[in-house]
């Protein structure tokens, strides 16, 4: 069983958005594309994706970068989108009026999105040196 503590060596920046009016399934579809990317790459990907979930997620990434800059004095260019979670929130229950006095239930789902960013440190950078990249070895972030 894994420990619940933080295993990353660098500082950790956190941003949380609660009660976002979209389903968690639709938000996870976008989140899976930006997990493990740098700050700039994540914003470029979100701008080009044709999903409505991209806007609140890009706002949250901007908020995490602002938290890093204000609270820890870190540069936005050195940030990495680390752990990202999308959890289901409360379901808003509404009634759709139908014929002959009936009403059909409508469920409007919400979700909570948490982004934990990390600073890219030069000593822990998993990308290999230029000589090894010329040989064809390229490491990928997990």
From Swiss-Prot:
TM region(s), chain numbering: none
Subcellular location: Plastid, Chloroplast
Biological-process GO terms, alphabetical: translation
Annotated Gene3D superfamilies: Ribosomal protein L22/L17
InterPro entries associated with the record: Ribosomal_uL22, Ribosomal_uL22_bac/chlpt-type, Ribosomal_uL22_bac/org-type, Ribosomal_uL22_sf
Primary subcellular site in the record, as a coarse category: plastid
GO terms of molecular function: rRNA binding; structural constituent of ribosome
Keyword RNA-binding: yes
Keywords per UniProt: Chloroplast, Plastid, Ribonucleoprotein, Ribosomal protein, RNA-binding, rRNA-binding
GO cellular component, one term: large ribosomal subunit
Function: This protein binds specifically to 23S rRNA. The globular domain of the protein is located near the polypeptide exit tunnel on the outside of the subunit, while an extended beta-hairpin is found that lines the wall of the exit tunnel in the center of the 70S ribosome.
Family from the record: Belongs to the universal ribosomal protein uL22 family.
Assembly information from the UniProt record: Part of the 50S ribosomal subunit.
Name the UniProt record assigns to this protein: Large ribosomal subunit protein uL22c
Species assigned in the record: Pinus koraiensis
Biological classification of the source: Eukaryota, Viridiplantae, Streptophyta, Embryophyta, Tracheophyta
Gene that this sequence comes from: rpl22
